[in-house]
Regions:
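Signal peptide processing junction and immediate N-terminal pro/mature segment
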Residues: 23-36
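A short, structured surface patch at a secondary-structure boundary
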Residues: 42, 61-126, 229, 272
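Bacterial N-terminal signal peptides
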Residues: 11-23
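Short secondary-structure boundary segments
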Residues: 66, 124-125, 200, 230-233, ...
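N-terminal secretory signal peptides that target proteins for export/translocation
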Residues: 1-7
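Short helices/loops that flank or line small-molecule/ion binding pockets
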Residues: 109-116, 138, 236-245
């Protein structure tokens, strides 16, 4: 039976792109006033959508409305300020213990207001404009990020550190990520890029467009997507894939107990079995961190590079030999795979954005 494979791919794909969700109907209820304190010093910041917000100089009660932003807050060491996040914020494991405010596309304004945040973090690609406007109506500032490339993710991390008034942490994290990417490019220098198909969904077959940060991450790993589409999440036919004949199929399941053998069922399916990559079992299976615009994406890039170009990792390059083993930001390099807290059952299309 190939059903388990479909569930594996579907589980990862549910987090990538969204259908139109129902209108936000939650309204904030009366909540008890927070304890009286001295007024916080305020200043203006500009988010990545060009919006000017007035926020505390030192935000201390933060709510994250996206898993990627929750991970970034932890990477910066500011998790003690995180007073709430979404049902999908599952990493690092401690994030699951934070008070929940609902989903990514349908958070509860009542629950958000009850936590008295002085800053809410949102991302343009996953959260809804209606949510941001509703927060504004309740005078709750919402800082938005909008990364499109891996470099943008690193820059967003550093900007968020500035917003949280911990610029040194942002510089440490950004420098570590940049150093690791530079070392990786040194390893891959001169090697031909592997032509890959990043599989988001099998039925229908959906991949990633050339303008997404996922496609950029593939490039950093010594790969190039065979899908040259301006759409972010294009649907493609098996006939087109058969014509393109990728060297590897890349999967990013959301749980750790997945191995190449779990994809062997592809060889029994019409359309798939005519692909050279399927016949040769050329599958790259990496962490779903690759679909989260957060610092951990670099770990997923490194893992993909190891699978596509094992010959490049026989000997560490000179710059890696010189790097100290106790790099200041190394603490946030999480394992390659995420433990899943969800079942393998199919989800609705409205949940597809939720793991971003």
């Amino acid at each position: 039976m190939f059903a388990p494979v479909s569930r594996i791919v579907r589980s990862a794909a549910l987090f990538l792109f969204g259908a139109t969700a129902a209108s936000l109907v939650a309204s904030a209820a009366q909540t008890s006033a927070p304890p009286a304190t001295a007024p916080a010093a305020m200043h203006d910041v500009t988010d990545e959508m060009g919006r000017t917000l007035r926020i505390p100089v030192n935000p201390t009660r933060i709510i994250s409305l996206a898993p990627s932003l929750t991970e970034t807050v932890y990477a910066l060491g500011a998790e003690d300020r995180l007073v709430g996040d979404t049902n999908y914020c599952d990493y690092p494991p401690d994030a699951q213990k934070k008070p929940k405010v609902g989903g990514v596309i349908d958070p509860s304004l009542e629950q958000i207001a009850s936590l008295h945040p002085d800053l809410v973090l949102v991302t343009k690609d996953a959260n809804r404009l209606e949510t941001v406007r509703a927060l504004e109506n309740f005078h709750i500032p919402a800082y938005a990020t909008s990364p499109h490339k891996v470099a943008d993710i690193i820059a967003s991390t550093e900007k968020l550190a500035d917003v949280l008034n911990i610029p040194a942490a942002g510089k440490i994290v950004a420098a570590d990520l940049e150093d690791r990417l530079a070392a990786l490019q040194s390893r891959l220098s001169g090697l031909p890029a592997r032509r890959v198909l990043f599989v988001v969904w099998t039925e229908p077959l959906i991949s990633v467009g050339k303008a997404t940060f996922v496609a950029d991450a593939l490039g950093k790993a010594g790969a190039v997507s065979v899908v040259d589409s301006a759409q972010d999440w294009p649907q493609i036919s098996m006939e087109e894939v058969a014509h393109l004949q990728p060297d590897y199929l890349v999967f990013a399941p959301s749980h750790s107990d997945v191995a190449q053998r779990d994809f062997d069922g592809l060889a029994n399916l019409p359309g798939w079995r005519i692909l050279n990559a399927v016949r040769e079992h050329h599958y790259a299976i990496i962490s779903d961190a690759v679909i989260r615009p957060a610092p951990r994406i670099v770990s997923a890039i490194e893992e993909l590079a190891r699978q596509l170009h094992p010959e490049a990792f026989a000997e560490p390059p000179a710059e890696e030999k010189k790097r100290p083993s106790d790099k200041a930001a190394a603490w946030f390099e999480f394992p390659d795979f995420l433990p899943s807290t969800r079942s393998n059952d199919a989800r609705t299309a409205g949940e597809l954005l939720c793991n971003r």
